[in-house]
């Protein structure tokens, strides 16, 4: 990288999958490689700064098509199907495919557990990938479950009110449509649509996108959990509240919901655990989560066991 180049022309966003040595890979916490060096040279020529987005290989073309990235560089093979969607530069390297087999006579130096631990986490401070991924995972899960609980309770109250007294007809229809769509589609599809379609032209933090996506997904499941908890409360509790002079809102807030919450707490805890595990797909939009951190370490050390245990 030439340090004294005027980079006032803006930035060039490069989408890649940094697990393909020697073209793009992690070293010392940074993404380097032949492709990266080439893109730095292009940016030096154009007077632009380079921003590298490490995302899943399958999402690179989507990132370019949606405008989230200006170029995709990841050792792609030119195919007829891909040419229908994107433009390729002239090929600047050729490679050949080989098949590898196990050599029974080869001598392999086995590493001790301590050596594997050092190689996977201590060398080049690779533990930081796990630490950063864990922090992002916790942040996404906590804020997403907050959105899920707040929106889920609101949807549950609207649907329950409609079932009991026929109110909120239009809102109930919207809520039912929302629940059908969200619960009937994979969360990965929802995440990709929100990032590459809805926020395609918006410069927004990936963590915020993940929080919104997982929060909206969680709300659909929380809503039905809360609704079942409300419906499980004996109808006599409603009648008792109304006989005491309380209106519907007061009865719901003071008598019904406290009992419903007590009944659904185990289910809400299960939803939190499920949401924590669902965040493992955040790497598809280039977000460093816990799973992505392990993938980066595994791509460098080729050790499958240790990163997964972490």
Show the residue positions of the predicted features.
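N-terminal, intrinsically disordered, polar/charged segments of Gram-positive cell-envelope systems
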Residues: 1-10, 106-114, 118-119
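A bilobed periplasmic-binding-protein/Venus flytrap-type ligand-binding module shared by bacterial periplasmic
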Residues: 97-107, 123
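Ligand-binding "clamshell"
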Residues: 80-95, 104
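Short secondary-structure boundary/capping segments
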Residues: 3-5, 88-91, 200-201, 273
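Structural motif corresponding to alpha-helix initiation and N-cap regions
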Residues: 57-58, 82, 175
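Transmembrane alpha-helices and adjacent helix-loop boundaries
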Residues: 109-310
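Flexible loop residues that form catalytic
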Residues: 76-77, 193
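Extracytoplasmic small-molecule ligand-binding "clamshell" domains
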Residues: 6-75
């Amino acid at each position: 990288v030439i340090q004294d180049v005027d980079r006032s022309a803006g930035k060039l966003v490069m989408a890649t999958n940094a697990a393909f040595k020697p073209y793009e890979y992690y070293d010392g916490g940074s993404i380097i490689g032949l492709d990266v060096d080439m893109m730095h040279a292009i940016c030096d020529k154009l007077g632009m700064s380079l921003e590298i987005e490490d995302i899943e290989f399958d999402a690179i073309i989507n990132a370019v098509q949606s405008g989230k990235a200006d170029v995709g560089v990841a050792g792609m093979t030119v195919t007829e199907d891909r040419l229908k969607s994107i433009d390729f530069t002239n090929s600047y390297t050729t490679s050949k495919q080989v098949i590898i087999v196990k050599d029974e006579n080869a001598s392999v130096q086995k590493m001790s557990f301590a050596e594997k631990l050092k190689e996977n986490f201590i060398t080049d401070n690779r533990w930081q990938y796990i630490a950063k991924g864990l922090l992002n995972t916790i942040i996404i899960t906590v804020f997403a479950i907050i959105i899920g609980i707040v929106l889920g309770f609101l949807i549950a109250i609207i649907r329950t009110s409609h079932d009991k007294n026929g109110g909120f007809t239009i809102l109930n229809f919207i809520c039912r449509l929302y629940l059908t769509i969200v619960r009937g589609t994979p969360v990965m599809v929802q995440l990709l649509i929100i990032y590459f379609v809805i926020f395609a032209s918006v410069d927004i933090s990936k963590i915020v996108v993940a929080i919104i996506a997982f929060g909206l997904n969680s709300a659909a499941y929380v809503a039905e959990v809360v609704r079942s908890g409300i419906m499980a409360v004996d109808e006599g509790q409603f009648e008792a509240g109304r006989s005491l002079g309380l209106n519907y809102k007061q009865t719901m807030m003071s008598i019904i919901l406290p009992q419903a919450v007590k009944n659904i707490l185990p289910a809400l805890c299960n939803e939190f655990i499920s949401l924590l595990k669902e965040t493992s797909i955040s790497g598809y939009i280039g977000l460093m989560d816990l799973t992505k951190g392990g993938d980066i370490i595994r791509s460098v050390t080729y050790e499958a066991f240790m990163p997964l245990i972490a």
